[in-house]
A protein has these predicted regions:
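Short, small-residue-biased leader/transition segments that mark boundaries at the very start
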Residues: 1-7
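Non-catalytic C-terminal accessory modules of carbohydrate-active enzymes
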Residues: 9-31, 35, 40-167
């Protein structure tokens, strides 16, 4: 994670459990006064391998406006930041899409409650169609390209679906 790189570059060596300890510390102290708090903590919980907690916080964030969990704020409008963040967590955390390197990378980590996830994603002028299950991903790109699936470089031919199994 980028925080590990940043800390290392600054000369700090963080213990392996720093994320878990900090997450648990702050969860005991946060009021979740903003609905955005839940989705941020969902992301962190997944990073710390607290899958059930991540799922619970994700659901709360997803339904925060719909169910008006703060008692009357939905009439004032929806929180587009939370909406965008839930999409980000869906794609970056659960689907595992990573655009931080030169090659597009996907490392699926679907919640066990999900059987499948399908979405379109445009990266560097290439349109990808992804269809994920718990054990495979099928990818179609509109141009010849390549991407990483769980660290393995996968070549794609334009408009030809490629299925990759993982576990």
């Amino acid at each position: 994670w980028s925080s590990d790189v940043c800390s290392s570059d600054l000369g700090y060596q963080l213990p392996a459990d720093y994320l878990e300890k900090n997450l648990l510390y702050y969860l005991k102290r946060t009021s979740h006064g903003s609905t955005l708090s839940r989705i941020v903590h969902a992301q962190l919980a997944e990073m710390a391998q607290f899958h059930e907690l991540s799922w619970q916080l994700y659901q709360e964030a997803l339904y925060s406006d719909y169910r008006d969990i703060q008692g009357g704020t939905t009439a004032e409008g929806i929180h587009t930041g939370v909406m965008a963040a839930t999409i980000h967590v869906t794609l970056a955390t659960y689907a595992g899409v990573d655009t931080r390197q030169n090659e597009l990378s996907i490392c699926p980590n679907l919640p066990e409650h999900w059987q499948a996830l399908a979405f379109q994603f445009i990266h560097q002028g290439v349109t990808y169609q992804f269809s994920l299950t718990q054990t495979s991903v099928t990818i179609t790109a509109d141009k010849d390209t390549q991407l990483l699936v769980q660290g393995a470089l996968i070549p794609l031919t334009a408009e030809r679906p490629k299925e990759v199994h993982y576990q």
